[in-house]
Curated annotation (Swiss-Prot):
<keyword id="KW-0378">Hydrolase</keyword>
<comment type="function">
    <text>Protein phosphatase that catalyzes the dephosphorylation of the C-terminal domain of RNA polymerase II. Plays a role in RNA processing and termination.</text>
</comment>
<keyword id="KW-0539">Nucleus</keyword>
<keyword id="KW-0507">mRNA processing</keyword>
<dbReference type="GO" id="GO:0008420">
    <property type="term" value="F:RNA polymerase II CTD heptapeptide repeat phosphatase activity"/>
</dbReference>
<keyword id="KW-0904">Protein phosphatase</keyword>
<protein>
    <recommendedName>
        <fullName>RNA polymerase II subunit A C-terminal domain phosphatase SSU72 like protein 2</fullName>
        <ecNumber>3.1.3.16</ecNumber>
    </recommendedName>
</protein>
<comment type="similarity">
    <text>Belongs to the SSU72 phosphatase family.</text>
</comment>
<dbReference type="GO" id="GO:0005847">
    <property type="term" value="C:mRNA cleavage and polyadenylation specificity factor complex"/>
</dbReference>
<dbReference type="Pfam" id="PF04722">
    <property type="entry name" value="Ssu72"/>
</dbReference>
<dbReference type="GO" id="GO:0006397">
    <property type="term" value="P:mRNA processing"/>
</dbReference>
<dbReference type="InterPro" id="IPR036196">
    <property type="entry name" value="Ptyr_pPase_sf"/>
</dbReference>
<dbReference type="InterPro" id="IPR006811">
    <property type="entry name" value="RNA_pol_II_suA"/>
</dbReference>
<dbReference type="GO" id="GO:0006369">
    <property type="term" value="P:termination of RNA polymerase II transcription"/>
</dbReference>
């Protein structure tokens, strides 16, 4: 078993749906978790498919919620965005960018390959200080409410297995292979260093 609590980060594009659903579930299971986005702005589905609503990362979830409530309560209730923002507000004040975080993690889960690439590139561009390893694992999760929930439960299962592991470094590859077979998903995995 790990001698200390597993430190987990979950990263998606905007830190609104996929990473926050995983944050919510992992937190409820008592895991040490933070969540992030990687883009320069938060983009939410707008009233039309090609017209997203764009916010700065400094905008709180409550401010986004109130803005969308004023703009079109029915539309944003129907598409689930108001529900998501309400949940997010109960977890933390607002979205955070991964590139601005200086905390160390044991495992970082990303929700799509472009986010994985951004996280790995960012970690590799930082000056190495402690040479502590961090495992970066990508799991493709579609940006829908249902897929975010399913992905969050799979991330949670992996984290719980890692928490019980005698040696995470030795057991992670085997665990990922087992999860790939069980879930029918493939994972990208690499190790970076702080």
């Amino acid at each position: 078993m790990l001698s200390s609590t597993l430190r987990v980060a979950v990263v998606c594009v905007s830190n609104v749906n996929r990473s926050m659903e995983a944050h919510s579930i992992l937190r409820k299971k008592g895991l040490s978790v933070r969540s992030f986005g990687t883009e320069s702005h938060v983009r939410l589905p707008g009233p039309r498919p090609n017209r997203p609503v764009v916010y700065d990362f400094a905008t709180t979830y409550k401010e986004m919620y109130n803005d969308l409530l004023r703009k079109d309560r029915e539309c944003y209730t129907r598409n689930g965005i108001l529900h998501i923002l309400g949940r997010n507000e109960r977890i933390k004040p607002g979205p955070e960018r991964f590139q601005e975080c200086t905390d160390f993690f044991d495992v970082i889960f990303t929700c799509e390959e472009s986010v994985y690439d951004t996280v790995v590139e960012d970690l590799c561009s930082r000056e190495q200080q402690t040479f502590q390893p961090v495992h970066v694992i990508n799991m493709e999760i579609q940006d829908t409410l249902e897929d975010a929930t399913l992905g969050a439960f799979l991330i949670c299962e992996i984290c719980q297995c890692l928490q019980q592991s005698d040696d995470m470094e030795d057991n992670l590859e085997e665990l990922l292979l087992q999860m790939e077979e069980k879930a029918g998903k493939s994972f990208l995995h690499t190790v970076c260093f702080y």
